[in-house]
A protein has these predicted regions:
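Carbohydrate-interacting regions of secretory-pathway proteins
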Residues: 19-206
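N-terminal export leaders
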Residues: 3-7, 19
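Hydrophobic h-region of N-terminal signal peptides that target proteins for export
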Residues: 12-20
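Detector for intrinsically disordered, low-structure N-terminal pre-sequences
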Residues: 9-11, 188-189
Length: 206
């Protein structure tokens, strides 16, 4: 009887681990988005976010998915897909969850068509330039961001785009996923056709 009870307890323990909604296969990582729901995020702005085929997608409007919790030192890993002309990004340490911008957060940019290395894909706006500038459009990508104290590193598809950049303006805050409107064309019309998708977002406290 004792042996059966011990086996039963072990099986129950394994079942609990298997069904944990926050569990990740790697030690220390917590899933914020797994393609199924947006329980860990609030939407602000007018971007038309919706769940499609295991991803959260937007192709119109200007807005953010803002994490419900704030974080200080961590690694974040996100899988994303964008059109070549899409304007997106991952904002970290956002101090105002109702109004996200580069003036109150660190903006890790995803924008292939911006020629300025301060704003290119993989750059941290006003903190870390990217050179040479990678291209993320038309494919799935993995972006890893490390924020520890005043030091920031960005890795895109295994290649460092920002290496140990320094800035101390913001110590903690929310995480925000962006769908932004593009630039105006010669007729003054804003490009609003870029598709942005996120299918997995994980975080690990440091």
């Amino acid at each position: 009887m004792k042996r059966r009870s011990a086996i039963a307890l072990i099986l129950v323990g394994f079942a609990a681990l298997s069904y944990s909604p926050q569990a990740s296969s790697e030690t220390g990582w917590v899933t914020l988005f797994d393609g199924k729901n947006l329980d860990h995020f609030n939407a602000i702005g007018d971007a038309n976010w919706r769940l499609e085929d295991g991803s959260v997608v937007a192709d119109k409007g200007n807005g953010f998915l803002v994490s419900k919790d704030a974080y200080a030192d961590y690694q974040i890993r996100a899988e994303f897909w964008v059109d070549a002309d899409a304007n997106s990004g991952i904002f970290i340490r956002c101090t105002d969850p109702e109004k996200v911008g580069a003036n109150n957060a660190y903006e890790v940019n995803i924008w292939d068509t911006r020629p300025d290395p301060s704003y290119g894909t993989g750059a941290i706006v006003n903190v870390g330039k990217v050179d040479p500038m990678p291209r993320a459009g038309g494919k799935w990508n993995v972006m890893e961001i490390t924020a520890k104290g005043s030091t920031f590193t960005v890795v895109l598809n295994g290649q460092k785009t920002v290496d140990a950049a320094q800035d101390a303006k913001f110590a903690s805050g929310r995480i925000a996923l962006q769908h932004g409107q593009g630039v105006k064309d010669d007729k003054g019309v804003v490009n609003d056709k870029g598709v942005v998708k996120f299918r997995k977002v994980e975080i690990k406290s440091l």
